[in-house]
Regions:
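Short, electropositive alpha-helical surface patch
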Residues: 56-72
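Short beta-strand elements at the ligand-binding edges of bilobed clamshell
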Residues: 111-130
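Short beta->alpha junction loops
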Residues: 47-55
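Mid-chain, well-packed structural core segment of small domains
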Residues: 68-106
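Glycine- and acidic-residue-enriched helix-capping/strand-helix junction motifs
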Residues: 15-29
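N-terminal nucleotide-binding beta1-loop-alpha1 segment
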Residues: 6-12
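A charged, well-structured terminal subsegment
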Residues: 126-148
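Extreme N-terminal starter segment of soluble prokaryotic enzymes
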Residues: 1-5
Length: 148
């Protein structure tokens, strides 16, 4: 069975509280339920990890390699625009990674137009709300199925 890491960066743990006009009213627990249900439908296993700390996210990406994770669905949140270290980790381990953003970052502030993660990801999904995570899993399942 394929296994995906669902990795979330800073402030994703306060979904539903943080700027609901941008990110919606669904909570982080709602996200976990949504993704778990879709993973079951796809027949893939999922592990979840969220951190507000850059180094923890790097560690989680490296751990995914050693744990044999097949793909990563990653919402790096604000680190999208700032973290060369996280981008280097994604590139370094070579696990197919789909970058996900709940909001449509291309229609937001100028500083959000740069994505270090997008440069090393196999695909990016933005502006689809929480459903973007399921889209990312679909993409990975198809990509990895074609590679076998």
């Amino acid at each position: 069975m394929m296994k995906f890491l669902i990795l979330n960066g800073p402030n994703i743990n306060i979904l539903g509280i943080r700027e609901p006009d941008i990110y919606g009213r669904q909570s982080y627990d709602d996200l976990l339920r949504l993704v778990s249900g879709h993973a079951e439908e796809l027949g893939v296993g999922v592990e979840f990890y969220q951190s507000n700390h850059e180094g923890d996210l790097v560690d989680a990406i490296q751990k995914a390699y050693f744990d044999g994770i097949d793909g990563i669905v990653f919402n790096p949140a604000a680190y999208t625009h700032t973290s060369v270290a996280i981008a280097d980790a994604v590139k370094g381990v070579g696990i197919p990674t789909v970058e996900v953003h709940i909001s449509e970052v291309s229609k937001r502030e100028a500083f959000r137009q740069v994505s270090y993660i997008g440069a090393v990801a196999v695909h990016t999904v933005t502006g689809r709300g929480l459903a973007g995570y399921n889209e990312a899993m679909d993409y990975l399942a198809k990509l990895l199925g074609e590679r076998k």
